[in-house]
Regions:
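Surface-exposed extracellular loop regions of Gram-negative outer-membrane beta-barrel proteins
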Residues: 1-29, 33-43, 165, 170-181
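Transmembrane beta-strands of outer-membrane beta-barrel pores
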Residues: 3, 23-29, 56-62, 71, ...
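Residues on the lipid-exposed face of transmembrane beta-strands in outer-membrane beta-barrel proteins
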Residues: 5-11, 40-44, 105-109, 161-165, ...
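Gram-negative outer-membrane beta-barrel transporters
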Residues: 12, 120-130, 149-236, 311-313
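Repeated loop/turn-to-beta-strand initiation elements of outer-membrane beta-barrel proteins
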Residues: 16-19, 49-52, 113-121, 169-173, ...
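Outer-membrane beta-barrel translocator domains and adjoining extracellular loop/strand segments
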Residues: 31-38, 65-71, 78-82, 132-142, ...
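Membrane-embedded beta-barrel scaffold of Gram-negative outer-membrane proteins
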Residues: 45, 53, 90-149, 155
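C-terminal beta-signal and adjacent terminal beta-strands/loops
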Residues: 227-234, 257-315
């Protein structure tokens, strides 16, 4: 059971500036605790073509440790829960309440390359700082996965650049690049700690999408190219020196659609280059051994896929 209240204050200067500040309070019966979660949003139209946005907020989340980490059931390892106070394996004293602060903002600029206002460039930055988080650690021991809560240094910084351009009528070009710096503190079997990159998180991703539509959007042609950067693969031996990175890999997609009355007929292809992760299941021949592991998937498992479809629009 939970009871809460929320208050919000808004200040605005029409078409120029607005700020929203909010405060929420909740009492949770299960945890027998009262939680305060402040948040705020700001928008400033510096010029008619330049907009600055900022936001921040504190949040809590009660984790469902198994369903949130369902991949742990796809391994041959034992699953244990570690109590912070005693250092023993005890689920009853396991704190499942996560706490994090997210702050960030964006700057958007509209300008003309061929025609006035035909292009938009935006820069985004967001940081999430975790003050308490639940970790499913598969790197402490080789034969088990250990769940524990930690207040060690853990954060995610995300930088993103978006560019959109419509050089001619009905032709849209969109490109984006995102860089992620994500680290977490994990425990070691000797009682110490180590700060490592968050596993299975790509360091960067970039995407290019080009779409062209004929008059009245009778035909729509769409093509997308994507490059996925490397991600750290967690060690399977308990020794952090044995961890490695996945390769960067491309993905290509294409689709064409035809509008006929209220129907849209479309056909396309996913993963055109037929790229697939090799050997995604470790020790597949012995599923009852602790070395069996199918949770470290960093790339596509399905190859090239063609599809056709029919969509009906009611309105």
């Amino acid at each position: 059971r939970e009871a809460g209240a929320y208050a919000e204050y808004t200040y605005a200067i029409k078409d120029k500036f607005s700020i929203v500040a909010g405060l929420r309070g909740d009492y949770n019966h299960y945890y027998d605790r009262f939680f305060l979660t402040p948040r705020g949003h700001l928008k400033w139209n510096i010029t008619p073509s330049t907009t600055l946005r900022a936001s921040g907020g504190l949040g809590y989340r009660s984790t469902n440790v198994i369903t949130d980490n369902i991949g742990v059931l796809a391994t041959g390892r034992a699953i244990t829960f570690l109590d912070n106070e005693s250092g023993k394996f005890d689920f009853r004293k396991f704190d499942r309440m996560e706490k994090a602060l997210t702050v960030g903002g964006s700057l958007t600029q509209t300008f003309g390359l061929v025609n006035p206002g035909d292009a938009t460039l935006s820069f985004d930055y967001f940081r999430t700082q975790f003050y308490n988080s639940v970790v499913a650690d598969q790197e402490m021991y080789a034969d088990r996965i250990v769940f524990y809560d930690t207040d060690g240094r853990s954060y995610t910084d995300t930088y993103q650049i978006d560019f959109s351009w419509s050089p001619v009528e009905r032709l849209d070009i969109f490109a984006t690049f995102r860089y992620t710096d994500s680290e977490m503190t994990i425990r070691r079997a000797d009682g110490g700690t180590a700060r490592v990159e968050r596993p299975l998180v790509s360091k960067y991703k970039t995407l290019l999408n080009i779409q062209y539509a004929t008059k009245f959007r009778r035909w729509v042609f769409d093509a997308t190219a994507q490059l996925n950067g490397p991600a750290r693969i967690p060690t399977q031996t308990g020794d952090l020196d044995d961890s490695y990175y996945s390769p960067r890999y491309p993905m290509f997609f294409a689709q064409v659609s035809r509008k006929v009355g209220k129907f849209d007929i479309y056909a396309g292809c996913e993963n055109i280059a037929d790229y697939r992760q090799k050997d995604p299941i470790l020790n597949a021949q012995d599923p009852y051994d602790y070395k069996f592991n199918s949770m470290n998937v960093w790339g596509p498992l399905m190859g090239r896929k063609f599809y056709v479809g029919l969509r009906f629009n009611l309105y």
